[in-house]
Amino acid sequence: MKSHSTLAWILCALLGACASQPKEPTRIMMQGFSISLPREKEPTWILAKQTPMVTIIGKPGRFSGESFAMQATVIKLPALDSPAALVKHVESTQRKELDPKRYRIFKVDVAPQKVHEQNCAFSRVEAAEKMAADGTGSPVNVMLETLTLICPHPKDPLLGINMAYSHRHFPEDADPSFAEDAATLMQTLDFEPL
């Protein structure tokens, strides 16, 4: 009886070791950086573009007109001598890129953020896109929330990554887990050899 019990324990251990383990998501390699696609219960993310300089993924939202997107772009940065200079540069650049004729800007917040001991900048932009509803001519506000992480490469501070996660939605369809989902995506960022 003891040998059957021992055999049963060995068999359980072997079967447990052979059980399928969750796979790590595929790393997307970019020039000096890598990221992972989101792991989700539903495989709704679409890889729209992938080059060594740009990766774009997106998925439809739960409601009509709602979408989520993540764009990682390798960028050139000016010579910046401090984390505060990076924050100031990012805020200035983002404000210039937001067209006031197209967007009503509610918030632009930029703060320093450490990623793998590298000084980065983290921003949150909340804006309303001014557009006319189909057929009515009445203006409709479509909200655009964007969380962006900008990091210089540790080996070449003039080379950076701009990783932006955005949610486009009607005002009543805000996603309460937006910031958490963005953080999950941004935590996949790694610096790679140049």
Regions of interest found by a model, annotated:
Residues M1-A8:
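Bacterial N-terminal signal peptides that target proteins for export
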Residues G16-A17:
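C-terminal motif of bacterial Sec signal peptides marking the signal peptidase cleavage site
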Residues P22-G32:
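Short, low-complexity, disordered segments immediately C-terminal to signal peptides
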Residues Q31-K96:
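Secretory pathway targeting signatures of secreted, lumenal, and periplasmic proteins
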Residues K41-T44, L159-L194:
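Surface-exposed amphipathic alpha-helical segments
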Residues K76-P78, E129-M131, H167-H169:
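Beta-strand elements of well-folded, non-transmembrane domains
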Residues E91-P152:
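Signature of long, low-cysteine stretches enriched in small and polar/charged residues
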Residues L149-P157, A164:
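A short, solvent-exposed beta-edge/loop patch
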